[in-house]
């Protein structure tokens, strides 16, 4: 990374001071604004948030800094995707680094773990990866306690609504599929998602579940599982996979399972998916918050991607959705601070953050939007409030806010396209060529 950043590292076990590169731009008369990153150092998702933040900070520093010419100093702390380490990391950023603002790439459980400490420190914080509705419910139910918290990934509720729409519009209506087997990993995430898929997507779309298969994440031979599914003769397989996703995917292609597959495959959102599967990822589709791989992008986001790919040569070579969220989230937070006169007093910053509205246009139409639901503001389709969540739009034709969900599909030639919703689709939802129509 460029040496305009000062980076401190927190390991999973304890805090160690590794290095400090002094930038003469940090003058005594203008102390730096300290932004802290909290997330996993060793995961593709954690690196995506960190890199998105780094690029935004580099751009802002190159333009002369913020708040009257102060440079931004970035410090970071590793959660190791562990709740206890995440709490320690949040404490470290506040007590040792004295941060002004925190950008988070934490997973759900970790964010929920450090939120009580956030409420004590009163530190402005933006989450970019988690979609936990319970985090936004904390803001809604105890606003004064949690008002410093914002999330620019749509919540589970918004994602779920679009899951249902995809089931009705594509799986049931377009494909005319009426039966499914749910193939679910044996994890807490898998179990919770299964309940939602069965109760909301399949039932609402009028699709009958013929079987429910739970597999161990360490399974290496999926042929017995796929053979069982073939004997059941469903119209399609709904896969729920967030851990070791490559194995069931590559074996699906290798075995040329004669049944279409869709669902949730977390690995499929990465540019490395094709290489990781040995070129056997064709036919797999997955649901993912935007912006994401496979989408057409607006000009500003395209410029960010080019800068990212020029600067980072190791994985992830293409930012995950939270990398984009971190990039634009830094701009949101800094813009609010400029109008508020800083990140303190907290109330002034929160008010201006609630007024943030960063709109991105493509070919004259609103493409992405980084604004936030205000306290008491009602989302029209659900009739619910989502204070401080990104202002998502779940009402077709999706012309008012941030889309909550994109469905992408990998094809057998190694390309990946967006197939849903219609506004963003640049490809068609298809079945693999070895399956008879």
What are these regions (language model features)?
Residues 99-212, 260-286:
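Extracytoplasmic ligand/sensor domains, especially the bilobed periplasmic-binding protein
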Residues 310-320, 334-419:
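Segments of small-molecule ligand-sensing domains
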